[in-house]
Amino acid sequence: MSAYIIETLIKILILVAVFSALGGFATYIERKVLAYFQRRLGPCYVGPFGLLQVAADGIKLFTKEDIIPQGANKFIFTLAPIIAMVSAFVSMAPIPFFPNFTLFGYEIKPLISDINIGFLFFLAVGAAGIYAPILAGLASNNKYSLIGSARATIQLLSFEVVSTLTILAPLMVVGSLSLVEINHYQSGGFLDWLVFKQPLAFVLFLIASYAELNRTPFDLLEHEAEIVAGYCTEYSGLKWGMFFLAEYAHLFAFSFVISIVFFGGFNAWGFIPGGIAILIKAGFFVFLSMWVRATYPHVRPDQLMDMCWKIMLPLALLNIVLTGIIILI
């Protein structure tokens, strides 16, 4: 077995382990953030400052009985959470999380695969995760799950179109689909960040990302007040945990991608080293998603579709046209 294969396997194991752990810890942070906004304490009883609440929740979750409803398609019911997990972690393959570094005289690239269509790969594999809620709802033999599945179809597919068109303008400026090249393009300093050259693209992509991640105010797929838990209604134990981990893995992936594409990535930020800089940026966008959840109410499905097709899509197309004209001039 070649050194490259061994290195890649080690990277995959580290990536899955780290982001699975971060997904669990993010629930603690989110509960604390929401509690602060609502003037509550949040988790505080299990361990110091409630830090062991994550472990307690994990033990409770993974020791629950795994129930498959009567009349459900067992194969597809089991396959759906696997698709969610696989798409979430595979989409991280082209993301450069840190600058290259040397370990025991060997240069380490902190990404799994530096492909020249990295951004396209990220969007395409992430979009494959759409099949998870669709299949889960169809296979569950539950009306609430089916409604969540229908909402997944219209919401995720619609915003996949918007996010893809939105990102075309920044890619036209850079001239590359590689996330590594996009990061290098902004290496000149603070003023080279694409957020200053493509502010509209940043805002549109951020909103579309929240819709694709099923985050509030766009969590129509599992809106508790309307459809119980949506496509997850019949899931319990390990399978439900896989959906939950996939959602947070997607959140971290999008936070890193937004940091790389619009905010200079892992380039040094003044006196702050690049590795620490990208952690600060990605952490901010994770916190921002929690802030939005605590602040904004849910939107109706018709409002969401109107915003997608009547506002965001025309703005994304207009941004592409204006960017093309500026480049030609």
Swiss-Prot record:
Organism of provenance: Helicobacter pylori (strain P12)
Membrane topology designation: Multi-pass membrane protein
Cellular component GO terms, alphabetical: plasma membrane
Subcellular location(s) per record: Cell inner membrane
InterPro entries assigned: NADH_UbQ_OxRdtase_su1/FPO, NADH_UbQ_OxRdtase_su1_CS
Keyword Mitochondrion among UniProt keywords: no
Transmembrane segments: 9-29, 42-62, 75-95, 117-137, 154-174, 188-208, 238-258, 269-291, 309-329
Stated role: NDH-1 shuttles electrons from NADH, via FMN and iron-sulfur (Fe-S) centers, to quinones in the respiratory chain. The immediate electron acceptor for the enzyme in this species is believed to be ubiquinone. Couples the redox reaction to proton translocation (for every two electrons transferred, four hydrogen ions are translocated across the cytoplasmic membrane), and thus conserves the redox energy in a proton gradient. This subunit may bind ubiquinone.
Keywords linked to the UniProt accession: Cell inner membrane, Cell membrane, Membrane, NAD, Quinone, Translocase, Transmembrane, Transmembrane helix, Ubiquinone
Entry-linked Pfam families: NADHdh
Superkingdom to which the source organism belongs: Bacteria
E.C. number(s) listed in UniProt: 7.1.1.-
Protein name per its UniProtKB record: NADH-quinone oxidoreductase subunit H
Protein's GO biological process: aerobic respiration
Subunit: NDH-1 is composed of 14 different subunits. Subunits NuoA, H, J, K, L, M, N constitute the membrane sector of the complex.
